[in-house]
Amino acid sequence: MKLSRQFTVFGSAIFCVVIFSLYLMLDRGHLDYPRNPRREGSFPQGQLSMLQEKIDHLERLLAENNEIISNIRDSVINLSESVEDGPKSSQSNFSQGAGSHLLPSQLSLSVDTADCLFASQSGSHNSDVQMLDVYSLISFDNPDGGVWKQGFDITYESNEWDTEPLQVFVVPHSHNDPGWLKTFNDYFRDKTQYIFNNMVLKLKEDSRRKFIWSEISYLSKWWDIIDIQKKDAVKSLIENGQLEIVTGGWVMPDEATPHYFALIDQLIEGHQWLENNIGVKPRSGWAIDPFGHSPTMAYLLNRAGLSHMLIQRVHYAVKKHFALHKTLEFFWRQNWDLGSVTDILCHMMPFYSYDIPHTCGPDPKICCQFDFKRLPGGRFGCPWGVPPETIHPGNVQSRARMLLDQYRKKSKLFRTKVLLAPLGDDFRYCEYTEWDLQFKNYQQLFDYMNSQSKFKVKIQFGTLSDFFDALDKADETQRDKGQSMFPVLSGDFFTYADRDDHYWSGYFTSRPFYKRMDRIMESHLRAAEILYYFALRQAHKYKINKFLSSSLYTALTEARRNLGLFQHHDAITGTAKDWVVVDYGTRLFHSLMVLEKIIGNSAFLLILKDKLTYDSYSPDTFLEMDLKQKSQDSLPQKNIIRLSAEPRYLVVYNPLEQDRISLVSVYVSSPTVQVFSASGKPVEVQVSAVWDTANTISETAYEISFRAHIPPLGLKVYKILESASSNSHLADYVLYKNKVEDSGIFTIKNMINTEEGITLENSFVLLRFDQTGLMKQMMTKEDGKHHEVNVQFSWYGTTIKRDKSGAYLFLPDGNAKPYVYTTPPFVRVTHGRIYSEVTCFFDHVTHRVRLYHIQGIEGQSVEVSNIVDIRKVYNREIAMKISSDIKSQNRFYTDLNGYQIQPRMTLSKLPLQANVYPMTTMAYIQDAKHRLTLLSAQSLGVSSLNSGQIEVIMDRRLMQDDNRGLEQGIQDNKITANLFRILLEKRSAVNTEEEKKSVSYPSLLSHITSSLMNHPVIPMANKFSSPTLELQGEFSPLQSSLPCDIHLVNLRTIQSKVGNGHSNEAALILHRKGFDCRFSSKGTGLFCSTTQGKILVQKLLNKFIVESLTPSSLSLMHSPPGTQNISEINLSPMEISTFRIQLR
């Protein structure tokens, strides 16, 4: 009876809610379209536009109604479950925390139990080689290996090739950094253009000659200045197999610090350029210079349709171990792959470098003699003291034997009789003389070797795919028996060391200012891409020529290319010359400005009530983002919105595919402010001081903050005005160890001598701080438990040995020393209705911890912001350490490229710097009961050197070069903003065996918190108050949120096949994230559910009709056979899938 009575009451409530909701929606329909006498002059046109909008609006109401019914159904299910579970305290979630915003109860998280199976199954249990195990096996003792210093002596029997000859492919290449010691443009002007020009001439001279090229950024720059004859010559060289484009990305990217969004984007940019200009599809990957290698890159290449890849920079001890076991060629499989769908055949180069002395065989003294650019009389020789000799009939026999001996020895490290011998180095084949020296001397050696049947060798120039095709053929017999001769490997190749204890973990943090700028650029680019495509389709629909004919798409293309260029392994890494860094920064800065314009223009068109009036507005009326950066090396500053009694529009964009309630903060000119929703409802506002200095309040600016509920990928309109009847809430301040002379309108309490503790709380957590303003403890309200979460700062110095830390290397002088201050820091505590925070001011870092009073995702984590300034220190690195009571032992977890989680072990047999790993978006530690996650809005180096600790290196200033070619230290430090979130989650019980798995997944809450932080809402104001301007209340392009575990990576307008303009198609890129279900999903405030990766196309969009949707390979290079329109999207966990979509 009790149950049925509850259902009766609940059913009645639902009926009322539905009726009231429908009434409100219909009422809002009228409110949205008031009569406007201004339109009477062009009545028919305006009326048509409005009629179309009304039809769209009714469709949306219908969709919303369906969504409400769906949510009610879920709520009934949830209610019945909660009744069966017994009564729950209604106070548990909402008992404390001033002003927490309650969410509608029907919008609770619903996870399909089938979606939990993936993470609960162990990943990659069928790998032959698991990198975590390899690190346990290797002793890392580094004995002298003889001529191959880091290896061992290689021997062979002369009859080993009697039955099957050795097949050698010599692959000429030139490694062209798009910026390092010179800028991209300077390298092109001085070197690269000559390589291309000579390539066309010299390859045509002899059809046996081959060459490979990787960086499309350079190829495209050259293509723009050459004539049609040269273009045809290049196409013909590719067609006859003499020239191969390898990888085909815009650059050869770093693999530690970039986010997968940018890795994919530069791959698409390169592949699209190749398709539109040359019509070629790369087959093999070539990564000889990135400083360590990520399985994320292997996955992306596989999904782009490449079948093979090559890597070079791997820890010398790992190379030796692989050489001993002949595992240098392997199928690289993702840790999470339960089958073999992600396998890609990978060749690891065995020796120290990709240069010629280290690629023909184990003895560099001999191999150097076969680099014919080093002949006597040239600009540089062989450091081993024996120069090359020009090949002639008198020495060809002895030289051929010497070279063949090296090839044979090298081949002993592999499982087949097919051998790769790269022939190149940085910016090689620049002079036409080198083409002659290398190709003519080698051809004489080849001709001689091939003529001697006793040598049992077949040798030739080849492309990378020539080599891999032969390798596949050698494995064919084994594969036909159902078992390849190559092992399966899972894991990654960080952290890289090229010799001794020289670990390349410094660059994980080097120049963090630009690492942060990179992520802001990514967020802006993605936001601009999505809004631009929606606006483009509406502009087509309403024939808005001003938008269609604008240069926005050209600017968008340039922004993609500038972001792509920055993913280069000497750019985002922070390992280029100072002026080259300025060049990269300037490119990013200019593109940021342009993207803000694209976002503003696109949003304006989409939110404009009468689309046909778009052409009549000047650009000054368009929406302007609230953040402005003055120069490439300064932090963004907020614009001040000038208020008056005349309302100003404030448009807020949610670039995420999830419905969200987020804080919106803008600066205004007056504290007496009112904010109204589009329907005229007043919005609760917190007014906070804008601080000109640590203890000086601005007299001209005030910060207003309010909660905004914004639809997925949508725009929400608010009105702000100055008003004496303001209902805003002023923040209160408590100051420790300092005081404010003029507090203005704010209540400020000065605490000079007090031992009183500092606390912050909301409805989820209570934080305790010490007198210095540093967090000491977190209490989770869900269970009332206190947890040690202790934040400290510390310094690393550099070793007293000859080799010291530099841009690449981290060589510390032992453990970090605590950050010591002479006078206690000034601490400022803010208590507000929307957020509260503690800010403490140290000499080198301004540290802010903030809690949001938002009942939802934003309220469950702790936001940490550090403004770091180490411009005056000498050979030091500053770190933030979080110490907790979590019993994590020596195990911790870091993400790879924001795509997947890689378990790590802190190994005592390795030096401290070897235990530092790259973190792109998150790192966590855990025990059987809890997980502590540090979410990051920028790539940095991270470690867990002791149980319960996470330490992140935030900036480094180093006075010397580390002897890796840069020839300078890092002394161009900026005032740098680092942004983090700390999330403490309760885990369901797990057994200890599960903790040893080679795979781990974040929780859904962690995933979405990371997305919220990396893709914040974007507030925009119209530049000038315009009384005649009318905007819709909102623009909501999706029918509902995408499933919780599906992320819209991009909606990227595809370039037209003719010219540089846009086509009508876009690349829809979706990522289904793997997540761990063993975390509480109650009260998370997620406005979505999971659907086993299924999305019905007809239920996807609201304002648009999907004209076509077809599957594609990741970078649009390939379409599956028999491709046709699909009506349902099906994504498997962890997969990133691209579709060609056309909307109208």
From Swiss-Prot:
Annotated glycan sites: N78, N93, N1125
Transmembrane segments: 6-26
GO biological-process terms attached to the record: in utero embryonic development; liver development; lung alveolus development; mannose metabolic process; mitochondrion organization; N-glycan processing; positive regulation of neurogenesis; protein glycosylation
GO cellular component term of the entry, any: extracellular exosome
Active site positions: D289
Membrane topology of this protein: Single-pass type II membrane protein
Compartmental location: Golgi apparatus membrane
Lumenal domain ranges by topology: 27-1144
Keywords: Disulfide bond, Glycoprotein, Glycosidase, Golgi apparatus, Hydrolase, Membrane, Metal-binding, Phosphoprotein, Signal-anchor, Transmembrane, Transmembrane helix, Zinc
Tagged with keyword Lipid biosynthesis: no
Record text on cofactor binding: Binds 1 zinc ion per subunit.
Cofactor: Zn(2+)
Residues binding Zn(2+), per UniProt: H175, D177, D289, H569
Family recorded in the similarity comment: Belongs to the glycosyl hydrolase 38 family.
Protein name according to UniProt: Alpha-mannosidase 2
Organism: Homo sapiens (Human)
